[in-house]
């Protein structure tokens, strides 16, 4: 019997690690830097996962202020991005898939260098065949990261004809739909 899935992509924030506290803290800090109102915890939690440009834009910010908020968030988050812990069982699952020969990749809205550093910090850099993440470009979206991950896996010889992404948010679902792959 062969696997019906040829490669598995994983979102990082909210799927591999519980990054909500660090994300929300950086978000609050960026808004506080400009004395801007801070959304309540429930609304703030909806900004864990989406691209930063969307999240701050959703609050009505644009132009130079939007860019400053994104940069302020990144500076604050960079100081704590290694703090989030993996969800229970995730590390074992990733090792089991890797040991079974399933090609694995990240496909995260987190910037690629941070994703690599975080996977290295968790001891997972050798479990993933590809660590793909967003670029600083506001046009970088989940679907482009998914396509990059699949292209890089294919370049390494993986069969990418039956991919799936594992994620936790509507952004993962939308990105998968746009990229034309199933999502769990």
Each language-model region and where it sits:
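Substrate-recognition "cap/lid" segment bordering the active-site pocket of phosphatases
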Residues: 83, 113-164, 170-179
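Glycine-rich phosphate-binding loop signature in dinucleotide/nucleotide-binding domains
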Residues: 2-3, 99-102, 152-160
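Active-site neighborhood of HAD-like aspartate-dependent phosphohydrolases
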Residues: 2-46
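Conserved donor sugar-nucleotide recognition element shared by glycan-biosynthetic enzymes
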Residues: 23, 48, 86, 142
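Metal-dependent phosphoesterase signature
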Residues: 57-95
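Substrate-recognition element of Asp-dependent hydrolases with the DxDx(T/V) motif
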Residues: 27, 90-119, 132-134
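Helix-loop "lid/cap" segments that line or gate small-molecule binding pockets
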Residues: 30, 50-64, 118, 149-153
